[in-house]
């Protein structure tokens, strides 16, 4: 479902039964439902805003999950010779594997893009994601990316995916280079 005034605001909602790929065959994930709603506001170029809620209920590879994910993202699009920024705050509340679940994730980034050869963008960023403090406490605090990508700010992390957005505090500096429309590099 999608309702919008193009270029000004948009509201999207969905309700799905996730599938998993096993040996090239898509199979429904038993007893799992995933839903959400997102509002995007594009009225002010200096402050673009996304507000969202995602819910999940069911059993998957990571165990029983029944919680809501609430988030807000505010950003300014990257443009040559301008400062841009990107901030996101996310909270999760509910239950996971029959334990109370409360987790959170924060992302802050500020950057500047130069014109000319390779269009370099220099940025400073910081990610923080909660983790479970005491596994015997009966409480879950590990942030769950739901069905999100691993790449994000930690760069491509290969097939084995050693990095997840949980239990991390990660400051960083990054340079993005755009060699062509098809190729981007980041250091």
State where each predicted segment sits:
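Extracellular loop and loop/strand-boundary signature of outer-membrane beta-barrel proteins
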Residues: 21-26, 58-61, 93-97, 158-161
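Surface-exposed extracellular loop regions of Gram-negative outer-membrane beta-barrel proteins
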Residues: 4-8, 65-109
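Membrane-embedded beta-strands of outer-membrane beta-barrel proteins
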Residues: 1, 37-39, 72-74, 108-110, ...
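Repeated loop/turn-to-beta-strand initiation elements of outer-membrane beta-barrel proteins
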Residues: 6-13, 43-50, 78-85, 118-122, ...
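Extracellular/periplasmic loop regions
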Residues: 88-92, 99-186
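Transmembrane beta-strands of outer-membrane beta-barrel pores
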Residues: 15-19, 53-59, 78, 89-95, ...
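Outer-membrane beta-barrel channel domains
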Residues: 1-23
């Amino acid at each position: 479902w999608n309702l919008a005034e193009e270029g000004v605001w948009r509201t999207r909602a969905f309700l799905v039964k996730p599938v998993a790929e096993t040996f090239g065959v898509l199979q429904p994930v038993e007893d799992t439902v995933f839903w959400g709603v997102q509002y995007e506001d594009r009225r002010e170029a200096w402050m673009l805003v996304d507000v969202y809620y995602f819910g999940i209920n069911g059993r998957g590879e990571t165990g029983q999950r029944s919680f809501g994910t609430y988030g807000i993202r505010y950003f300014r699009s990257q443009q040559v010779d301008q400062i841009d920024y990107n901030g996101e705050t996310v909270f999760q509340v509910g239950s996971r594997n029959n334990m109370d679940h409360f987790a959170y994730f924060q992302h802050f980034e500020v950057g500047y893009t130069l014109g000319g050869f390779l269009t370099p963008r220099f940025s400073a960023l910081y990610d923080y994601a909660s983790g479970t403090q005491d596994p015997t406490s009966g409480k879950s605090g590990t942030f769950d990316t739901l069905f999100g990508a691993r790449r994000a700010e930690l760069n491509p992390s290969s097939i084995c995916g050693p990095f997840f957005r949980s239990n991390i505090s990660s400051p960083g500096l990054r340079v993005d280079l755009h060699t062509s429309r098809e190729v981007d590099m980041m250091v």
